[in-house]
Swiss-Prot record:
Subunit structure: Part of the 50S ribosomal subunit.
Name recorded for this polypeptide: Large ribosomal subunit protein uL1
Function: Binds directly to 23S rRNA. The L1 stalk is quite mobile in the ribosome, and is involved in E site tRNA release. Protein L1 is also a translational repressor protein, it controls the translation of the L11 operon by binding to its mRNA.
Matches recorded under NCBIfam families: rplA_bact
Signal peptide segment: none
Bilayer-spanning residue ranges: none
MF terms in GO: rRNA binding; structural constituent of ribosome; tRNA binding
């Protein structure tokens, strides 16, 4: 049996018309429907015309949000030797090698992002069953397997995000906070759109963009006019 909607959600849904909104209008409505008693995130859900079970239709990459994410990112780094000092100096929240691997193997997940140097990946790979389901496994495509720890930590702390299409071809991403001005949210959303277009899988056939919806964490889903977003030119 379908769960009954709260009066709050029913009222919010009534504000949303069954149309694809212009990007700015959609974001303004998303902000208006962010009425929960906590600071809600701005979410985007994008259905693409890909089938990720095929290797040439998988999408996993990164995007830099020009206005940031609005949240503190806790970065853990697995490295050894002089790279430990480099990571510490760059502002990593947790740094270690065998000691950190052991902590994670025992269930410690007190971080939002895990970066590793290539030489320690054989050891990190043993944590796959713990890290994989949480989307925390370092990967070269995601920019989280690197020797340039200082640059990677700086970028992820500043608003760089790793994202992927799930097994149904949908990208789920938080692109800021609902408290951001519409202009800031639009800049971030445009960056996401451009990243997805730029990284179109080689095996993608037919219509690439299917639907795009935005919502506050506890708000209703609002469809965005994809063509209007892709054609949008922001002032530089």
């Amino acid at each position: 049996m379908a769960r009954k909607l709260s009066k709050r959600m029913q009222a919010l849904r009534e504000k949303v018309k069954p149309i694809a909104y212009a990007p700015e209008a959609a974001l303004a409505l998303m902000k208006e429907t962010a009425t929960a008693k906590f600071e809600e995130a701005a979410e985007v859900h994008i259905r693409l015309g890909i089938d990720p079970k095929y290797a040439d239709q998988q999408l996993r990459t990164t995007v830099v949000l020009p206005r940031g994410t609005g949240q503190e990112i806790r970065v853990a780094v697995i490295a050894r030797g002089e790279k430990v000092v480099e990571a510490q100096n760059a502002g990593a929240d947790r740094v270690g090698y065998e000691d950190l691997i052991e902590e994670i193997s025992k269930g410690m997940m007190d971080f939002d992002l895990l970066i590793a140097t290539p030489d320690v990946m054989p050891q990190v790979a043993k944590l796959g069953r713990l890290l994989g389901p949480r989307g925390l496994m370092p990967s070269p495509k995601g920019g989280t397997v690197t020797m340039d720890l200082a640059q990677a930590i700086k970028e992820f702390k500043a608003g760089k995000l790793e994202y992927r299409a799930d097994r149904t071809g949908i990208v789920h991403l938080i692109f800021g906070k609902c408290k951001f001005p519409v202009e800031a949210l639009l800049e971030n959303l445009k960056a996401v759109q451009e990243s997805i277009d730029r990284n179109r899988p080689s095996g993608a056939k037919g219509k690439y963009w299917r639907t795009l919806h935005v919502s506050a964490t506890m708000g209703p889903s609002i469809e965005v006019d994809i063509n209007a977003l892709r054609e949008l030119k922001l002032a530089t």
